[in-house]
């Protein structure tokens, strides 16, 4: 049993996709009741009747103390922690419509707010927590990041993630709330918020590259090289944007990158496999219920890298394949034909121990 964890009366989750549902299952172990916001009222009723999110996470029974609702205010009322798991490109629209609910029911009671969405907003090049900060200025916002396939989280399989906040005490507060007493979902605290968000966004793009390698028929050596070099791209952008680098070689960076780049449970990896096999992005979109996050992230990531003069060759080639009529085979040939260089790169700055 894990000591020092915190229990609450009520939790709220905005976003009912696979990961939002999975995190709600975790909260249900820590709260007397949990409410999940789902945009479709009829579907919310079906989920409550079946005790299963048949739309986004079939095969994972939902706890009895977890309910879905299409009423955002009902979801927020009385919550002692609020998680956001709304897709990044739709986050701003939700907040424009519902931020008054957060101010009335969350900010006024100093409730912890945790961003769990991943990606980069196309219009602003902001990360999810930065978008939320525009609507809740000067309010402490946490982030959850790390290797966590939704179905495994929902079924209580062993998972470790990071909780991040600018104030380490807030990160630790969220850590105590989200960590389950049986240790099946365990959190580690950090202050490298931007590092967590960058890693969470970039690993999806890099997973497309890894899947494309698989689709082209390569084996483990090539994937290991891609993961290693991809990790350095995460590091370079993190340092360019002012992160400490603490998250890069931990759970949000290395951990999530290894998971997402190595399993067909990852939608991003699967999209990459299909691209490597010569299937067009249009055909993939047409035959898929949900598009992988990395597809939406690759384009704003390309612009963000240029803005900060960050050299991200692997991510750049993913962008070329997705949006510039590139070919996966030619892209990898180009990457493997680049100018010879030293492996030794500047070390990460030292960070204080947590």
From Swiss-Prot:
Its main location: other. It catalyses: sn-glycerol 3-phosphate + NAD(+) = dihydroxyacetone phosphate + NADH + H(+). GO terms for cellular component: cytosol; glycosome. NAD(+) binds at residues 15-20, 90, 118, 150, 267, 293. It is found in: Glycosome. A motif (Microbody targeting signal) lies at residues 352-354. GO terms for biological process: carbohydrate metabolic process; glycerol-3-phosphate catabolic process. Disulfide bonds: none annotated. The keyword Cell membrane does not apply. Its EC number is 1.1.1.8. SUPFAM superfamilies: 6-phosphogluconate dehydrogenase C-terminal domain-like, NAD(P)-binding Rossmann-fold domains. Belongs to the NAD-dependent glycerol-3-phosphate dehydrogenase family. This is Glycerol-3-phosphate dehydrogenase [NAD(+)], glycosomal.
């Amino acid at each position: 049993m894990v000591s020092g964890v915190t229990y609450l009366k009520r939790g709220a989750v905005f976003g009912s996709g696979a990961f939002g549902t999975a995190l709600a299952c975790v909260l249900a172990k820590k709260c007397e009741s949990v409410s999940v916001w789902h945009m479709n009222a009829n579907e919310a009723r079906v989920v409550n009747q079946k005790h299963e999110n048949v739309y986004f996470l079939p095969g994972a029974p939902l706890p009895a103390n977890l309910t879905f609702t299409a009423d955002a205010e009902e979801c927020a009322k009385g919550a002692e922690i609020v998680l956001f798991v709304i897709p990044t490109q739709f986050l701003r629209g939700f907040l424009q419509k519902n931020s008054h609910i957060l101010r009335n029911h969350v900010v006024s009671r100093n409730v912890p707010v945790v961003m769990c969405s991943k990606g980069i907003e196309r219009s602003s090049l902001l990360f999810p927590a930065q978008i939320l900060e525009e609507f809740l200025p000067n309010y402490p916002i946490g982030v959850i990041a790390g290797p966590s396939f939704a179905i495994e989280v929902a079924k209580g399989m062993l998972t470790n993630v990071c909780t991040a906040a600018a104030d380490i005490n807030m990160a630790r507060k969220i850590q105590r709330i989200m960590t389950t007493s049986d240790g099946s979902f365990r959190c580690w605290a950090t202050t490298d918020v931007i590092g967590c968000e960058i890693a969470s966004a970039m690993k999806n793009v890099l997973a497309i590259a890894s899947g494309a390698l698989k689709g082209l028929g390569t084996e483990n050596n090539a994937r290991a090289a891609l993961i290693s070099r991809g990790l350095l791209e995460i590091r370079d952008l993190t340092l360019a944007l002012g992160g400490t680098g603490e998250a890069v070689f931990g759970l949000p960076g290395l951990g999530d990158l290894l998971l997402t780049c190595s399993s067909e449970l990852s939608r991003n990896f699967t999209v990459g496999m299909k691209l490597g096999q010569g299937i067009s992005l249009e055909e993939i979109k047409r035959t898929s219920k949900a598009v992988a996050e990395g597809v939406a992230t690759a384009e704003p990531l390309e612009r963000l890298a240029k803005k900060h003069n960050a050299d991200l060759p692997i991510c750049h080639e993913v962008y070329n394949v997705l949006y510039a009529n590139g070919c996966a085979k030619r892209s990898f040939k180009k990457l493997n034909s680049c100018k010879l260089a030293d492996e030794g790169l500047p070390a990460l700055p030292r960070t204080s121990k947590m």
